[in-house]
Amino acid sequence: MLALVKLALRITTDKYDERIQQLIDAAKLDLKIAGVVLPATLDELCEQAIITYCMINFLGLSDDEFDRLQKSYDLQKGQLRSATGYTDWGDQT
């Protein structure tokens, strides 16, 4: 996951690996708090949400870019929360 996020952020140095890993972990926690159960092997939807979260919190963005990416992340998180296989709400019957 670290390599994918670094590629998306266009980071080629290892200098920021610790910070980027913290953001990856924070993204996973944010999704978990929202009720998303991440699969053991992350799929493309989960990876993209994590990448977007990292972009929001790592890059120095303009207000417009920040708002655009935040909306994108919120939509991605919402889709995961409502999709079958990404939540564990238990038996609702």
Give the ranges of each region predicted by the language model.
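Conserved short "hinge" loops at termini or chain/domain junctions
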Residues: 1-49, 56-57, 61, 68, ...
